[in-house]
Structure formats: C-alpha cells, structure tokens
Amino acid sequence: MLEDELEKLVIKYKIDDKKAITYGHFNVKTNFVLPLPGITIYEQTGLNFFFIYFDKNGITFFQLNEKNQVISKSFISWNDIKDFKYKNGLLLEDEMIITINNETLKVKIAKFKACNEWLKDNNTYLKGNNHFYK
C-alpha cells in the first residue's frame, strides 16, 4: 500500500516533516491515437509517479516503481528555481509548474487517492504552510 511505502521513505531518508510529502506525476505526453472500430489505441510517455517532499532547501522527487517503491531521488534547490506556480485544478489534480533555467517542468499533484487519506491532509498542510508557493 502507498502509505506503507511512505513510512519506509520517511525512515530511510530521515525526513523530518512527514506532512510535507505529497504524491504526483509529470505531465503525460500522448504520442499518438489510433481510433479503430470498437477500440482506441494510444501511446503515452512520461507517466512516472513520485513522492514529492518540500523543505526549506527545495523540492525532492522520489520516483516510484509499479509497486510504489522508491527507485530514485532527485533534488531541486529553491535557489535554482527561476519561477514556481501552483494552480488549483477542478477535479482530481492540481498542477505545479517549475521553471529551471530555460526548462519548464509540469507536475500533476493528486488531490486524493483511494484508501490514502494522508494525501488530502498533507496537501492541505502544504498549502497552509505556504510550501506550494515560493
């Protein structure tokens, strides 16, 4: 379960503030769509899920595999971020837009996930403590 992997992450990486972690993925790119009678075939790239940790130094992305286990870690310092925007979505996801030098990353932040009440609580905590706004 996702919450079990979150607990492992907190212990392994000695994370001080468990509530400063959320869950999301980078924007998905659709490469092609092939509509056929009775079925539609499409190819997408970029669907990698992450635990995303915010602290005073920056944002850490912990990439997850299909079992929601951490397989890699990437860090972006607040000093390296040229522009940071957070847009509230209508239904399932919000969007975080990070600009580093000339590159823009679009990250979808899940508002909730079935059987994972912590996600909604953590997102409320992050918004309330201004973590989503540089």
What name fits each language-model region?
Residues G38, E43, N65-N68, E103:
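Generic preference for well-ordered secondary structure
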Residues E5-I11, I15, V70, S74-K134:
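Acidic, Ser/Thr- and proline-rich intrinsically disordered linker/docking segments
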Residues M1-F54:
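Anionic N-terminal interaction surfaces
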Residues D55-K67:
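Short, conserved turn/kink motifs that form compact alpha/beta structural patches or helix kinks used as
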